[in-house]
């Protein structure tokens, strides 16, 4: 459940799609601005910016928004964002990693801590959770990319480490330093990915169900709704039956 695709599908079924899309565009814009500010403003010469722009396009973000986010980085009045990682535990002992981009460290920390506390979790110290995870490349395709066998064959050919497929699509995992190379090979074979990023992958999953699963969903939803938060990862293992029950 590291990418929370099933969580997101449930949230969208609950009628949150429009608000979630607006929030998503805001987060994508922030990543583009930070990427452009930390390197060259040309995606062809800035790998991080290239990935940020690709991810924005995959989410159908308008070109004007993308260009505006890049130009914002070149302005003298552009905000200075700090990248911060928070780690904690949710209901059922589930590990949670939160990545933030913020222009106010104190505000972000207070808000993230409050969200954990209000939703059955607790914020931990640095590396209280991350030591149980690997930092890897993650490439996500929808089910339209092809069958599990087709994607697996393309991933092996591209040099990927692992593939996970389900009804929501395909997640391809790569070594940290092989992401760009594998992503380019997969694009040639399968077309543009829905998302390409450096991500956290848990070494072991934590089963969770019932009330703990319901509260965990609220925790992750609240974290993802927080303006300063860019990505949320958990090692929750929730069965498909449990997720459908929670969605009803």
From Swiss-Prot:
Show the NCBIfam families listed in the entry.
Answer: PRK00110.1, PRK12378.1, YebC/PmpR family DNA-binding transcriptional regulator
Assigned protein family: Belongs to the TACO1 family.
**GO MF, one annotated term:** DNA binding
The organism that produces this protein has a lineage beginning with: Bacteria, Pseudomonadati, Pseudomonadota, Alphaproteobacteria, Caulobacterales
Q: Which GO terms describe its cellular component?
A: cytosol
**Which SUPFAM superfamilies has this protein been placed in?**
YebC-like
Q: Which UniProt keywords apply?
A: Cytoplasm, DNA-binding, Transcription, Transcription regulation
Stated name of the protein: Probable transcriptional regulatory protein PHZ_c3068
Q: Does the keyword Calcium apply?
A: no
Q: Which GO terms describe its biological process?
A: regulation of DNA-templated transcription
**Signal sequence bounds:** none
Q: Write down the species.
A: Phenylobacterium zucineum (strain HLK1)
Where it sits in the cell: the answer is: Cytoplasm
Which Pfam families has this protein been placed in?
TACO1_YebC_N, Transcrip_reg
